[in-house]
Amino acid sequence: MCSSDLAAPTPVASPAPQPPAVPMHDQDFARRVVGISRYLNAIRRYGFLAVQLDPLGTPPPGAVELHLDEYGITEADLELVSGEALGFPHLKTGKDVAERLKYRYTRNLAVEFVHCGTDEERQWFRQIFTAEQLTRPLMPDEKKKVLQRLSQVEGLERFLARAFVGYKRFSIEGTDALVPMLDTALEESAAAGAHTVAISMAHRGRLNVLTNVLGKPIEQLFSEFMGRHDHLVGAGTGDVKYHLGYNNDTETRAGRKLHVTLVPNPSHLEVVNPVLQGLARARQRNATDPYERDEFAVVPICIHGDAAFPGEGIVAETFNLAHLRGYSVGGTLHVIVNNQVGFTTEPVDSRSTRFASDLAKGFEMPIIHVNADDPEACVIAMRIAVAYRTTFGRDFLIDLVGYRRHGHNEGDEPAYTQPLTYEKIRNHATVRQLWGERLVREGVATPADVEGAEREVAAQLQRIYEAAKVAPVAAHGWEQFEEPMTPVVTSVRSDLLLTVNEALLTWPDHFTPHPRLVKQLDRRREVMDAVGGIDWGHAEALAFASILADGVSIRLTGQDAERGTFSHRHAVLRDVRTGQSWTPLQHIAGTASAFEIYNSPLSETAVMGFEYGFSVAAPDTLTLWEAQFGDFVNVAQPIIDQFLTADRAKWGQDSGLVLLLPHGFEGQGPEHSSARLERFLQLAAEQNMRIAYPSNPAQYFHVLRRQAFQKSRRPLVLMQPKSLLRLQQAMSRANDLSDGAFLAVIDDPARSEEHTSELQSHHDLVCRLLLEK
């Protein structure tokens, strides 16, 4: 018998000890605690549905989840459970806890945050609604300041209505609190380190924001109404006053310097959104290191309409850019100016969601709904929004729920289509009146204070109006409007071409590109020493490298732009073993400029709009957008029509954006055969845009360099035919780059003088025949 057989027998396990039975009353207590905890979480989650948001009295929808019986508990149960058992040791009972949470979540701030993407964000909201640093009420002096601002807002609208009867102004009345909200955004952003705030908005309330937030002189606004002020002094078509932009250097109440910009925009609602993002991205660049950005330095604020926000697809397209590496701006503050009607269309016919803001939830954006008749809640909401952006670098949305006191414009009769709503509005006190009454009740102001603020604003506006009537017509304008196109030397010394070419073909020793690609790139080294052989992709790389070497930064984006839609660019190399990337154009020795290239999302309108905004704010950068093969440029037609071709005439604004439009007649069907050259030629009839159809790589090389260094900025549209990219007969020689220049028309070296004479005679004969007819 082996020793193992003599082992001691395994002892029989004794029964596991059982937990002591919980007395029935303890089980009831546990049930109460669980039910109350679920109820308290429901207040946080669904409390926004119980907030009175409509100034006109429509009751909130409520939610069954806010009823005690949903959790099998009663008011008495709330009294029986201590606050400590629920995680609130400083509160006596569960009822005290519930009342505290109701005060925070169902009173005046309707907050939606449980859909946010991280636990950290959700916990942040729980903390700020427990503490009072961000949600604290306004101090008496702050309340008086809000009264002063509301008096200025309402006073301007009333004065314009009286002085310029029948003129459109797209009044802010009903959402007046937007102005103190923007005051808060500027103040808090500057305190967080911003030196610039850039704003985009449509026509509603724009005149008030221009004057009362950006500081546009009111006398200038009055002169525009009188027809005595032309911001372009006859140099262009100009635009209606509620489309114009403005820039100003201001100082916050705390003494911090701040540059504030309102971006000009067309009537096409929301299409300015990506333009704002691109402008902000450009201005966030570090002045000393072009690859570094300070997202705290520039804060974008995007103001939307309640009908356009869910209705216009550009909103979602722009949201999708928010966290992409090529487009992030560190968060945007969004405000929906929600007057609960789209021209004459009711919400039931303009969206398929409960709230106008629901689209934002799909992008994990926190939302606060506020009643526009409660300026204090509006200011607190903006305070929270700026703090959230500063903390997380993400977008935040405020839904400002108000009304529109007049029709779509002041000449419109809204009672035709919304008779009941406008009966309520006619009998509803203004935001300023309600706020003044509240301050009187609270003892913060006297009736004389409230009336005095109103009279002071009216008297000031009357003085400005009288002065504007006799002031000379403004004579300042865009002196550079007719700036001529200057000659640019686009050739590059052959030794520099060889140097940058070698840099383009150099990568780290440990880096392994695809072997087939290495063979293609090696050919680029060989052709620099031989006659002919430079193709389009090679010429582009040399153009970019030489532009960078001359101190101009480059930004190129588009669908599949890194590789190139025809696999001709390969600006970004990939290591076949590790997947790591290497961008040779970012390693040109001795350059202080930056090369940025990004594959864009599958969007044309938003991405082109973004690049347009970037190009406006970064005149020292060659900015390019490349369409995907398939004639997809027409998807971005609003950006082309309203910004690229018309910005100079309407707003005196310049862009040097380059559009690269790959296409060709290779039997690929009607969707891949035309970049619509004829449309661009029509749009460029006033020399507001440059259009080129290069037929060889050298032409492409020179036109890119000319665009990079041309002082007179215009958009450049470049047709890029697919069939010529690698065509042997269309290749260029190295000396075409070092000795040549861009040719508006390429002469045919094979033509004969005799043929030219015959052609001229034929032309003259045809002209005579036409004249005789």
Residue ranges and their predicted role:
Residues 6-177, 194:
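Extended, charge-enriched "interface" segments that sit outside catalytic cores
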Residues 342-353, 361-397, 402-406:
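Conserved phosphate-handling catalytic cores of large alpha/beta enzymes
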Residues 21, 31-41, 48-77, 217, ...:
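Flexible, glycine-rich loop/tail regions that form catalytic "lids" or insertion modules at the edges
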Residues 1-3, 755-761, 765:
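Short, small-residue-biased leader/transition segments that mark boundaries at the very start
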Residues 155, 159-219, 522-525, 534-548, ...:
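Active-site pocket-lining segments that scaffold enzyme catalytic pockets across diverse folds
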Residues 134-156, 227-289, 584, 710-753:
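Active-site cores of enzymes that catalyze phosphoryl transfer or operate on phosphate-rich substrates
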Residues 27, 169-176, 259-270, 288, ...:
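Alpha-helix capping and helix-loop boundary segments enriched in small/acidic/polar residues
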Residues 195-368, 566-618:
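Cofactor-binding active-site loop characterized by glycine-rich and histidine/acidic residues
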